[in-house]
Structure formats: C-alpha cells, structure tokens
Amino acid sequence: MVQQRGARAKRDGGPPPPGPGPAAEGAREPGWCKTPSGHIKRPMNAFMVWSQHERRKIMDQWPDMHNAEISKRLGRRWQLLQDSEKIPFVREAERLRLKHMADYPDYKYRPRKKSKGAPAKARPRPPGGGGGGSRLKPGPQLPGRGGRRASGGPLGGGAAAPEDDDEDEEEELLEVRLLETPGRELWRMVPAGRAARGPAERAQGPSGEGAAASAASPTLSEDEEPEEEEEEAATAEEGEEETVVSGEEPLGFLSRMPPGPAGLDCSALDRDPDLLPPSGTSHFEFPDYCTPEVTEMIAGDWRSSSIADLVFTY
C-alpha cells in the first residue's frame, strides 16, 4: 500500500503524501523501541517523524554533508512549514505515543547523565615536601620579643607572657616629660610607666641625664634598640612647639629660664605713656561731636581725692 502511494506520487510529480512510513512499519515489531542493549527509546515527536524521510533525501543528494549541517537545514525547513502541513505528522506522533504507553506501561523517562571525565591527576610534588617555591620562606628572626618567647617554650614560658603584656600597657600610656639638655630644654612624649619610675629624674640637671638613662636601661625591655630612641628624640624635637603641657611643670620651666637678653623683659611695660613721643592721634582724642560734659571729664584730673567729686549734679 505504501509502495503504491509512492509510485503514484512519482507519476504525478508531487511530494509523497504523509503516511506512517518506516515509523509505522517499525511499530508493528514487538521490540520496536528497544535497543540491542535493552534501552527503551522515547517515542518520536512530529518533527522526528517528518525528519526521517527528509534526512534520507538530503543524504541521497549530498552524501558528504555532515550530520550537524543536515540537522540545521531540517530545523529551518520545519520552521518554514505551515501548521496545516504539520498536522499529519502530529497525528502520527500521537499514535506512536499511545502505542508506546501500551507496550511499555512502566516506562519512565530517565535522561542519561553526562559522564564527567576523570579528574586530572595531581601534579607530582618535588621531593622535600611542602609546595616547592610557592611558599614563602620564613625570614630571619629578630632578637626581640620573638626570640625571648621562643627561648621560653612554645608559648614563651610561664612569666614571659605577663611581662610582655605589662610592657605593652606601659607603651600605650604616654605622658609629657621634660628632657633637659645642655643648651636646650624640650618636652617629649614618653611612656607613663617610665616617667613614674622616678620623680627625682625630672629635677636632675644636664649632668644627671646620663646617669638616669643608665639607671633606667636595665628595666627596659630587651627588644628596644638605640635606633628607636633616636627616632623618638627626633620626633620630640620636631613637635616641641605643638605638645600640650599640663600640671606644675610649666611653672618650673619658666623658673629655670636664665635671666638675660633671652628672657622676657617686662620693664618696657612699666613706662609712663605720657613720656612716649606722640605718634599720630591718641586714643583719648574724640571727635567734635562729644558733649561738653564728656570733654570736661576727659580734660579733668582722673585721680580724684574723694568719691564725692565723681558724682554728677544736673
């Protein structure tokens, strides 16, 4: 019957009428959706029913054409078809779906999972352990707190940790302290713990500064180096005019200033202003719009002998 339809179509010169084709012939077989491995295939849809015949035609015309290119052309042609032309193939796909359900009632679509390739093998590490040159090498340890903690054990011993904490607290609390030098006096921010160790150190002169520094040096931590002391001294010299001074130390600072030309000369402030040469107008000269009473009061004697003279009578 199918061959007769195809022969009639060839004689008429038109396309063969849509019929069941190979899909219907395969449906008559008992295992028409089973593969040799036992896998049950999905029922074909309308496009698959239509593309079976069209694919064969393209393969006959262009046998060297790639399968992907054939699929692209079939997809474009299917989209160009009108809905009325797709109706026969839609009906055939529905019939195949119902037959598939009758033959395989327990069928459930389970798409195959894409097999992931084996994970790439880890690169062999060079002998010697570690990550090679990617890891940073530990630098030389400075002789400071780290060295003291390492010598005391993994945690620096029992008394090393409290001692370090005390030193940190002393460095956080700062206090203004006067440093006396041979030709100059300046203010410096020093740790409060060091300033409180001896109040007598502030009263020492230039000669006692070296002795005070030598006496305080054993109590300082081992990690403080001379370079840090030089930097602190330089910083104190730069900011000597900006530091804030509190307490009684400013009074002592003024009392220890040597008298002389460098000191403050207050004698110029005690001079009588009447003895100064007149320069321009005085601040006691008022314009002409002053009242006679005000002019008389200004011209009169300010140093009255009694309070009664200052009372005005109108």
Curated annotation (Swiss-Prot):
Disrupted gene: phenotype observed: Knockout mice are viable, fertile and morphologically normal. Increased expression of Sox11 in brain and cartilage at 14.5 dpc, with increased expression in liver and kidney at 16.5 dpc. Increased expression of Sox4 in spinal cord and cartilage at 14.5 dpc, with increased expression in liver at 16.5 dpc. Sox12 knockout naive CD4-positive T cells fail to differentiate into pT reg cells in mice with dextran sulfate sodium (DSS)-induced colitis. Sox4, Sox11, and Sox12 triple knockout mice are embryonically lethal and show severe thinning and undulation of the neural tube.
Induction: Induced by T-cell receptor signaling in naive CD4-positive T-cells and in splenic and thymic regulatory T-cells. Up-regulated in splenic T reg cells by dextran sulfate sodium (DSS)-induced colitis.
Compositional bias per record (Acidic residues), positions renumbered to this chain: 162-173, 221-243
Expression sites by tissue: Expressed in splenic and thymic regulatory T-cells (at protein level). Expressed in embryonic molar and incisor teeth.
Keyword field contains Transcription: yes
One GO biological process term: positive regulation of transcription by RNA polymerase II
Segments of skewed composition (Basic and acidic residues): 174-187
InterPro entries, per database record: HMG_box_dom (IPR009071), HMG_box_dom_sf (IPR036910), SOX-12/11/4 (IPR017386), SRY-related_HMG-box_TF-like (IPR050140)
Entries under SUPFAM superfamilies matching the protein: HMG-box
Entry function: Transcription factor that binds to DNA at the consensus sequence 5'-ACCAAAG-3'. Acts as a transcriptional activator. Binds cooperatively with POU3F2/BRN2 or POU3F1/OCT6 to gene promoters, which enhances transcriptional activation. Involved in the differentiation of naive CD4-positive T-cells into peripherally induced regulatory T (pT reg) cells under inflammatory conditions. Binds to the promoter region of the FOXP3 gene and promotes its transcription, and might thereby contribute to pT reg cell differentiation in the spleen and lymph nodes during inflammation.
UniProt-recorded name of the protein: Transcription factor SOX-12
Organism for this UniProt entry: Mus musculus
